[in-house]
């Protein structure tokens, strides 16, 4: 690899909109994210499941099917 052409990789603090902070590596000075593992619904277990039954009923009602 050539010397002096690559950006400096350093430790940075990643800040989430929820207030959580953690350390990671990046070539940027600071990282801000909107969602992290502390507030993402997949990791918190507060997922919202859309039931397909409601959509099927709506389709059947719209087109007169049983």
Curated annotation (Swiss-Prot):
<dbReference type="Pfam" id="PF01197">
    <property type="entry name" value="Ribosomal_L31"/>
</dbReference>
<feature type="binding site">
    <location>
        <position position="39"/>
    </location>
    <ligand>
        <name>Zn(2+)</name>
    </ligand>
</feature>
<feature type="binding site">
    <location>
        <position position="16"/>
    </location>
    <ligand>
        <name>Zn(2+)</name>
    </ligand>
</feature>
<comment type="similarity">
    <text>Belongs to the bacterial ribosomal protein bL31 family. Type A subfamily.</text>
</comment>
<comment type="function">
    <text>Binds the 23S rRNA.</text>
</comment>
<dbReference type="InterPro" id="IPR034704">
    <property type="entry name" value="Ribosomal_bL28/bL31-like_sf"/>
</dbReference>
<dbReference type="GO" id="GO:0046872">
    <property type="term" value="F:metal ion binding"/>
</dbReference>
<dbReference type="InterPro" id="IPR002150">
    <property type="entry name" value="Ribosomal_bL31"/>
</dbReference>
<dbReference type="GO" id="GO:0003735">
    <property type="term" value="F:structural constituent of ribosome"/>
</dbReference>
<feature type="binding site">
    <location>
        <position position="18"/>
    </location>
    <ligand>
        <name>Zn(2+)</name>
    </ligand>
</feature>
<protein>
    <recommendedName>
        <fullName>Large ribosomal subunit protein bL31</fullName>
    </recommendedName>
</protein>
<keyword id="KW-0699">rRNA-binding</keyword>
<dbReference type="GO" id="GO:0005840">
    <property type="term" value="C:ribosome"/>
</dbReference>
<keyword id="KW-0862">Zinc</keyword>
<dbReference type="GO" id="GO:1990904">
    <property type="term" value="C:ribonucleoprotein complex"/>
</dbReference>
<dbReference type="GO" id="GO:0019843">
    <property type="term" value="F:rRNA binding"/>
</dbReference>
<dbReference type="InterPro" id="IPR042105">
    <property type="entry name" value="Ribosomal_bL31_sf"/>
</dbReference>
<keyword id="KW-0687">Ribonucleoprotein</keyword>
<dbReference type="GO" id="GO:0006412">
    <property type="term" value="P:translation"/>
</dbReference>
<dbReference type="InterPro" id="IPR027491">
    <property type="entry name" value="Ribosomal_bL31_A"/>
</dbReference>
<keyword id="KW-0479">Metal-binding</keyword>
<keyword id="KW-0689">Ribosomal protein</keyword>
<comment type="subunit">
    <text>Part of the 50S ribosomal subunit.</text>
</comment>
<keyword id="KW-0694">RNA-binding</keyword>
<feature type="binding site">
    <location>
        <position position="36"/>
    </location>
    <ligand>
        <name>Zn(2+)</name>
    </ligand>
</feature>
């Amino acid at each position: 690899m050539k010397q002096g052409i690559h950006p400096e990789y350093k430790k940075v603090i990643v800040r989430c909109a929820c207030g959580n902070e953690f350390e990671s590596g990046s070539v940027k000075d600071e990282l801000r994210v909107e969602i992290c593992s502390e507030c993402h619904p997949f990791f918190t277990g507060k997922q919202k499941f859309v039931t397909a039954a409601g959509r099927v009923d709506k389709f059947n009602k719209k087109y007169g099917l049983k």
